[in-house]
C-alpha cells in the first residue's frame, strides 16, 4: 500500500499558508510503513477537486485529503466527494449530538448549519473530531476503485493530527494486519548533527521494521522511534530496545520519553521537590515566566517574575550594582548572577533564574554577538545558604527564535539543577 496526499485550499496556492499538514501526514504514514508517493495542492474548485480525486485514486490505494470540510461557501471537499462517488449525504447522529452538546456547554444557541455540519457521505466510516466540529470520513471506493480508500480530514492542524493518530492510523494498521509502535524521545541542549553522531552506531544497526525520525524544532530536537511488524511482542521488544539504547547514549541531553514539554517536566519536578521559583528577565521579556505558567498547577511553585529591560530597572528592582554593569556590561554572567540573587532575595523562593542577553538582530559586537545570553540560577538551601550558578549560551536565529532558545536554555539550567 502507498498513499497520496491532497491538500485543498486556495491559500496554499497563493502562498498565504504553508502546507504543514502534508509533512505531518507523511511522517505519520512513514512510521506506519505506508510510503507517500505524491503531495498535491488543489484549489477550492469542485471540478479541480474531482479531477484530482480521480487521478490519485487510479494510482494510490490510500488517498488522504485535508481541508474544505468547514461550513463556509468555499469549503467544497465534502460536496465534491459526494458528487464524485455518486452517494447520498446522511446525518451522523453521533456528530450531531456531540456538536449540540458543545453549543450547550458554551451557552450558545445552535445555528442552522448544525445539521449540515453533521452530514457525512453514505457508507463511510465516520472519524469523530475531538478537537473541533467537522467530522472526518474514511471511504472505501469499491464502486469505481476497488480496494482503494479516500480519507477526508479537516485542514485545521490540531484537528487533523488528533484524527490521524487516534482513528486513521489504527484503522489502516488493522486493515493491513500490522502492528505499529511509536516512542518519543525529547532532547535539549544538543543539535541534530551532534545528536546523530552520538547515536550513529545505534542508527546503523536498527532491526528490520524499525525506523528513526529526527524532528528538529526551534527549541531542540525530538526523536521518534517507529517499529512495524505483525507480531506485537516482537515489535514492542524492538522498539523498547532501540529507545533504551538511545536514551542511554544521549542521557545527558534526554529529558523525556513521552510527549511532554520541558516546562511541564520542570513544573512536575518543582512540585515533587516542594521547590518554589521566580524569574528575573531582561532579553526574554517574560518568556521564561510565561512558559512556566503555561503549565496547569503552576501556582503550586511559581511565585513571581521580574521583567527588567533597562539597566536602571535592573538596579532599582533587583539591586544589581551599577559598578557591575559598568565594569562587566549588562550582558555578562556577573550581572546575570546579581539578577538571580536579587530576585531570590526579594521573592523569598528556593530558586531564581535570570536572563540577560542580545536577542538581535542588532546590538551585537564581536565579543558579544547577537544570539548571546547569560543566565543565572540562584538556589537557596536550608543550612547551606545561597549557591549561584551562571552560564553563557550562544545561538543563531532571528529575534523570536533566539528568545525562545534563550528561554529553553534557562529551563534546561533549572532542570539540570533539580535533577542533580
From Swiss-Prot:
PANTHER family (UniProt xref): NICOTINAMIDE-NUCLEOTIDE AMIDOHYDROLASE PNCC, NMN AMIDOHYDROLASE-LIKE PROTEIN YFAY
Annotated source species: Chlorobium phaeobacteroides (strain BS1)
SUPFAM superfamilies in the record: CinA-like, Molybdenum cofactor biosynthesis proteins
Top-level taxon of origin: Bacteria
Pfam families associated with the record: CinA, CinA_KH, MoCF_biosynth
InterPro entries to which the protein is assigned, alphabetical: CinA, CinA-like_C, CinA_C, CinA_KH, Competence-induced_CinA, MoaB/Mog-like_dom_sf, MoaB/Mog_dom
UniProt similarity note: Belongs to the CinA family.
Lineage: Bacteria, Pseudomonadati, Chlorobiota, Chlorobiia, Chlorobiales
Protein name per UniProt: CinA-like protein
HAMAP family linked to this entry: CinA_B
